[in-house]
Amino acid sequence: MTAPLIYIVAGEHSGDVLGARLIHALRAINPSIRFAGIGGPRMEECGFQSLFPMHELAVMGLIEILPRVLKLRRRLQQTVQDIETRRPDLVLTIDSPGFCLRLLRAIQPFGIKRVHYVAPQVWAWREHRVKRFPGLWERMLCLLPFEEKWFAERNVPGQFVGHPVLESGADQGDAARFRARHSLADNARVIVLMPGSRANEAGRLLPVYGETLRLLMQNIPTITPVIPLASSTAHTVRGAVSSWPVQPIFITDIADKHDAFAAAEAALTKSGTSTLELAMGGVPMAVTYRVNRITAMMARRLIRVPYVAMVNLLAGREIVPELLQENCTPTKIAAVLTSLMNNAPDTNGMGAADSQKQALKAVVASLHAPNRHASDGLPSSAAAASIMEVLGQ
């Protein structure tokens, strides 16, 4: 009997991480499973060969995507042809709904089983899109606790398998190890900067981050910025920070990143999954985001949720400050970070950093799924078990 072939499509860094964990979890169930498709460096470490460089799919924003439409269309056609040629037993698409939903629709006539991992965030904006989902997949795997019910109410079966940040190791960092490895002085005050894994979003935020550091240094002269580098943005980041008043520590190792979390007094991050990663590490944070003005104007008309930071959505209130668009200024950001790093009393009389940490613990606890898919409780194992159910194995 031929070993099953699973065709995985991941379009950005976070999807690459999920894909790598899934490959490990699926091989733990059936070591003979074969893989093909599109992925990044983390999946390639598992022996995965990508059809083309994954970073070509990593673009965000209504305006930013326009110059790349033709190339993305060619890559979509190439992927469809590859799937038709290979005839895999199952196609697994991970996040990147702009590309993946078009792909799933295009391969619908092939009769191949399909699973989509990471529910499209139609609950946040353009809810009408949910009407197009029936028939696109046999199963959708949800990361967030409210999604299964939300989609079920709209006749789209989803399955909450837990959030992968729970197995990221973000809560296992060692502050002393980080300080020793990077020869930090005893009075060095660490702040983690996470401008995003897409070059366009990082390019907009880094100048703001640099000026914010300049302001922070007036009151915190020993501030020590740390930037976890993604390969997709390394060139952009290194070029942007050359004029900063203090040069950051660049880290590429995941364990080193988690050690940085443990050593950090605060973090400055873009919105998205990074907020959950920092929450797992117990790092107080401020959330920032900037996009093209036209994109922002259109998004404000379409978005139907009160917050952009995932931790705030899950908490149902603003537990971390959101500094977006016109509020994403060095002066405002520096004021928030100063309050966090000095643990200044908030309106309840609790330290700003301590208050955030307490609220973030509750958010992390909500990310655990019921133990119905995998004995070890890991989200990737639950997702792999669900995928094998679809395969009929």
From Swiss-Prot:
Q: Which family does it belong to?
A: Belongs to the LpxB family.
This protein's UniProt keywords: Glycosyltransferase, Lipid A biosynthesis, Lipid biosynthesis, Lipid metabolism, Transferase
UniProt GO cellular component terms: membrane
Top-level taxon of the source organism = Bacteria
Lineage of producing organism: Bacteria, Pseudomonadati, Pseudomonadota, Alphaproteobacteria, Acetobacterales
Q: What is its EC number?
A: 2.4.1.182
Q: Pathway involvement? A: Bacterial outer membrane biogenesis; LPS lipid A biosynthesis
| An annotated Gene Ontology molecular function | lipid-A-disaccharide synthase activity
Report what the protein is called.
Lipid-A-disaccharide synthase
Whether Protein biosynthesis counts among this entry's keywords is: no
GO BP: lipid A biosynthetic process
Matching entries from InterPro entries are given as: Glyco_trans_19 (IPR003835)
Provide the catalytic activity annotation: a lipid X + a UDP-2-N,3-O-bis[(3R)-3-hydroxyacyl]-alpha-D-glucosamine = a lipid A disaccharide + UDP + H(+)
Concerning HAMAP family, the annotation shows:
LpxB
Q: Which gene encodes it?
A: lpxB
**Function per UniProt:** Condensation of UDP-2,3-diacylglucosamine and 2,3-diacylglucosamine-1-phosphate to form lipid A disaccharide, a precursor of lipid A, a phosphorylated glycolipid that anchors the lipopolysaccharide to the outer membrane of the cell.
Query: SUPFAM superfamilies this protein is in?
Result: UDP-Glycosyltransferase/glycogen phosphorylase
Does Lipid metabolism appear among the keywords?
yes
Question: Entry's Pfam families?
Answer: LpxB
